[in-house]
Amino acid sequence: DSPKVVKFVFSDHHDAYVLERADKLGVANASLELKEFTSKVDYEKALVEILEAQEIDLILLAGYMKIIGSTMLARYKGKIINVHPSFLPDFAGSPHAIEESHEAKYGLGITIHYVDEGVDTGEIIAQIPVAYHESLEVYEERVHEAEHELYPKVVRQIILHQQ
């Protein structure tokens, strides 16, 4: 039993399936696209306003492929968590970490970490290895299974520790 629930979903793509899923579950949601703003700072200011209006105190990233800027970090430092599909520091910052770790046959695993000013350089919270498979599709499936197993456990521990 989790002491908190997902109360808000945000996407940086208006057509993201997660927004449809949130609607079906009755979870408040919104989307903004960077191209709608004159600068990343303006984009992040608008996002912070939305998050503050929803009283969000912990941000969980999944598939958010933008670098979190100083506007977000100033407001939510130590409150943004990311899941990365490699055993960091291997393939930090790579948008193709699954493919690259599979091809290299190292860095095989996932990492849950706090977001800081760098790219995939924040404090590591948890890591688990993922067994190599010669098929990229099978390996990718294993990575996603590991993410779905570890991420909720880590978040639950963080929430319980904050209370």
Predicted regions and their residues:
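Short phosphate-binding loop-to-helix
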Residues: K35-K66
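Short beta->alpha connector loops at strand-helix junctions that form conserved
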Residues: A30-K35, V83
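Structural motif corresponding to alpha-helix initiation and N-cap regions
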Residues: A16, K40-K45, S70, S94-P95
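Donor/substrate-binding cores of folate-linked one-carbon enzymes
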Residues: D12, L58, A62-Q162
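A short acidic, often aromatic-flanked loop/helix-cap motif at beta-alpha or helix-coil junctions
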Residues: A16-Y17, K35-K40, G118
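Short, conserved SAM-binding/catalytic segment
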Residues: D23-S31
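N-terminal Rossmann-like dinucleotide-binding module
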Residues: D1-Y17, R21
